[in-house]
């Protein structure tokens, strides 16, 4: 079983913001896999389905970003899934808009959602797909920046990155993470 967690904040006012790219990737996967992500369980919107022979759980935590670990620890304990089969997708200010990066494990850096997850799981030994949202301009508040929407001139690049992130996660599930990293970490 694979658990794919997209990080974001619940509520209309956060839709399509930089901080919610994880939710956007889950929406793409849900459509692609014909999985309805509408059931409320484990402080999250979840949907279960199959990708090939693999059972897949798509997850959009509803706890707000900084408490995302509460959702994931509940799911981890309930489903008894291997850490290597938990894939977290989230925004990264250290990557330019349009870029993605896949890692088998590692720190969450300055990302508060990832800090919450690694703290609650007691490990950072799980795959993650980072979607570039770029850095704020000099003097711009980081919180305001990540809660902002993409500029019109960024829309093609971010849409391409979201599709690429969904394809990379599909590759992780259908093939393996090493193949996905070779294919998408360019």
Curated annotation (Swiss-Prot):
Its EC number(s): 3.1.1.29
Function: Hydrolyzes ribosome-free peptidyl-tRNAs (with 1 or more amino acids incorporated), which drop off the ribosome during protein synthesis, or as a result of ribosome stalling. Catalyzes the release of premature peptidyl moieties from peptidyl-tRNA molecules trapped in stalled 50S ribosomal subunits, and thus maintains levels of free tRNAs and 50S ribosomes.
Subunit structure: Monomer.
Major localization listed first in the record, in broad terms: cytoplasm
SUPFAM superfamilies linked to this entry: Peptidyl-tRNA hydrolase-like (SSF53178)
GO biological process annotation, one example: protein quality control for misfolded or incompletely synthesized proteins
Any one GO CC term of the record: cytoplasm
Annotated GO MF terms: peptidyl-tRNA hydrolase activity; tRNA binding
Cell location: Cytoplasm
Residue(s) at site: Stabilizes the basic form of H active site to accept a proton: 91
Species of the source: Clostridioides difficile (strain 630)
Known catalytic reactions: an N-acyl-L-alpha-aminoacyl-tRNA + H2O = an N-acyl-L-amino acid + a tRNA + H(+)
Family (UniProt): Belongs to the PTH family.
Catalytic residues (positions): 19
Binding-site residues for tRNA, renumbered to this chain: 14, 64, 66, 112
Pfam (any one): Pept_tRNA_hydro
Sites marked Discriminates between blocked and unblocked aminoacyl-tRNA: 9
tRNA-binding listed as a keyword: yes
Secretion signal, residue range per the UniProt entry: none
Xref: InterPro entries: Pept_tRNA_hydro (IPR001328), Pept_tRNA_hydro_CS (IPR018171), Pept_tRNA_hydro_sf (IPR036416)
Protein name per UniProt: Peptidyl-tRNA hydrolase
